[in-house]
Amino acid sequence: MAVRKIERGHYFEDFEVGHLFKHHWGRTITEGDNSFFSSVTMNFNPSYFNREYAQSLGYKNVVVNHMLVMNVVFGLSVEDLSERAIAHLGYEKMKWHETVYPGDTITSESLVLSKRDTSRPDRGVVKFRTTGYNQRSEKVLEYERPVLIRKRNPSS
């Protein structure tokens, strides 16, 4: 059976500085998600899986692994920002704000900060600021990332 290729994502030319993408979906993070992610990444911080330990540190429950939060916020942005990416060029100015607990629902949005051509005519770099929120609209994470993205028309 042949695989049908579906064209998705934005080209470099499609991004406008100042445009705000409000990424659809959202993801409720469960205690199972948190335990699995922490185990598979070998991040055995007891505050991620031991309620009494987390409470002894002042948290109301186990906390969600910070890197799981980052990956969910990032994942929510992929469809809008980087389906046509050639490469992610890094993550900058990453800052966690509110603690995320199992049961919290994460949403995200991304602002186009800048775009520039590169020395190769078939690609350009777009820089985004992505912000993640919980279900109470509290900021949980914010970071910037430059992405190398294909051009629709390499001569433009």
Label each PLM-derived region with a short phrase.
Residues 1-16, 100-156:
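HotDog/MaoC-like acyl-thioester-processing domains
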Residues 1-90, 152-156:
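Hot-dog-fold acyl-thioester-processing enzymes
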